[in-house]
Amino acid sequence: MVTMSSPTDSSPSNSFSDFNREEQSRLSDEVRQLKRTNSDLGARNAKLAEMLKSSRDKLSVLFSQLEDMAQPPSVYGTFLETAKDGSNAEIFAGGRRMRVAVSPMLCAADLMPGVQVRLGEGNQVLEACDFEQTGELATLMEMIGRDRALVSDRSGEERVVKLAGPLMDRTAKLPRPGDTLLVDRKAGYAFEAIAKTEISRLALEEAPDVSYQDIGGLDDQIELIQDAVELPFLHPEMYRAYNLHPPKGVLLYGPPGCGKTLIAKAVANSLANRIGETGTSYFINVKGPELLNKYVGETERQIRVIFERARELAGDGRPVIIFFDEMESIFRTRGSGVSSDMETTVVPQLLAELDGVEDLSNVIVVGATNREELIDPAILRPGRLDIKIRINRPNKQGAHDIFTRYINDSIPLAEPAEDLIDRAVDHLYTPRPYVRLTLIDGSVETLNYHDFVSGAMIANIVDRAKKSAIKAHIDGTGVGLTAEQLIQAIDDENQQSEDLPNTSNPDEWSRITGRQGKQVTHAEVVI
């Protein structure tokens, strides 16, 4: 007989098991949820801690900036020297000299004479900065030992200053007289030598590129100046053997535009080429009017600087040419001044340089002027400007020679160069009255256009003709320079010259032509 169990016998235990499982599942879910929540809260906490740290750092920076802003401004001064006690420093700040303490954190090697230093609240040197880069300019007159210099400002006031660190560098070359220095007058220091010296503003120390072949119609004058200038430098042993001293100076004079400056440049170029590998020649080209200065004694000082520089360059046997252009502008006859007597001190300064106590070997002075009568006679005497070479206006053959320098096969020509030159010279020297001069004895002399020909005028004529040839080439009416264009250029040059001369001073006419003779009392332009 089979016994059947009642459903009520297992129902309570099953229900409890199901409940238990459900409860465990619920609790597991809660645990997992709590773990996730805990992880999120931990991440948030870490992020908040990081943000808090960043905020504290920023706050610290802001507090530091506020403290810096509350600090008094730094004062800067110029370091002069280390005090005798070895721990303090002598500085110049605020217009007064002070002895202050030096921060122990500062390297003593950084404190060089003349350097800018930053001071703290207690006037303690905290930092060494750079050297002053702005200030006043002064000209070095002469060195006083190794660390001091005598300088002069634009007003001519002289003072002694010390040299700052860069100028005291043993590996650097000391500044020389004539150099322009950057100075602080109050601190009494010179910080830097400006590269452009006073000499370089007035002179050109390299040889020009003009040769004797570029000069036409002056063969005799070129030979004279070669004998006077080049021979002593090229054959010094011969001069010593004959106990002959080279000339100290040469004067080139004559009408304007006839090649005086060109000859001086060609001499310097020839010396440079002939010396070549054995050395270098120097050409100091001094423009007379640039030496003039309104301050008393400034012109004389500049002349001294020029000759000091020349002696320095010539110290090792190299030839140096000092070329004074427009010489009459600064070396006029003493006592001839109208509003001033500047020449009474300028002329003696040049005389002292030419034949003074200091030796002037390997240096030769070449002067150029078209008003030689204005130059002081003491300069022109033998022993100073020994050689005097007159540069006359070119004659017909000389003009032909000058034309060949400008008209040759290197430019487009419509006719042979020789034919063009012959026709141009013939037309240029055809007698055509220009001005009638009445002399003091009553005689009358008529000057023609060709009496005023110069090398500069011929160069201008050729330039005019070349411009006409270019215009004809552009228009398609012709190619190359023609004789008609040269003749037209000569006529245009003569026509434009008619109204230019000043006839109010008749005596100037004889000087313009380069003639010496009787005094002119009246001049009349022939129309």
Swiss-Prot record:
PROSITE patterns: AAA (PS00674). Keywords: ATP-binding, Coiled coil, Nucleotide-binding. Residues 21-53 form a coiled coil. Residues 1-38, 492-515 are annotated as: Disordered. The keyword Methyltransferase does not apply. Residues 19-33 have a biased composition (Basic and acidic residues). InterPro entries: AAA+_ATPase (IPR003593), AAA_ATPase_domain (IPR050168), ATPase_AAA_core (IPR003959), ATPase_AAA_CS (IPR003960), NA-bd_OB-fold (IPR012340), P-loop_NTPase (IPR027417), Prot_ATP_ID_OB_2nd (IPR032501), Prot_ATP_ID_OB_N (IPR041626). Residues 1-18 have a biased composition (Low complexity). Pfam families: AAA, Prot_ATP_ID_OB_C, Prot_ATP_ID_OB_N. SUPFAM superfamilies: P-loop containing nucleoside triphosphate hydrolases (SSF52540). It comes from the Bacteria. Gene3D superfamilies: 1.10.8.60, 1.20.5.170, Nucleic acid-binding proteins, P-loop containing nucleotide triphosphate hydrolases. GO terms for biological process: modification-dependent protein catabolic process; proteasomal protein catabolic process. The keyword Transmembrane helix does not apply. GO terms for cellular component: proteasome complex. Residues 497-507 have a biased composition (Polar residues). GO terms for molecular function: ATP binding; ATP hydrolysis activity. HAMAP family: ARC_ATPase. NCBIfam families: pup_AAA. Homohexamer. Assembles into a hexameric ring structure. Belongs to the AAA ATPase family. This is AAA ATPase forming ring-shaped complexes. The lineage of its organism: Bacteria, Bacillati, Actinomycetota, Actinomycetes, Mycobacteriales.
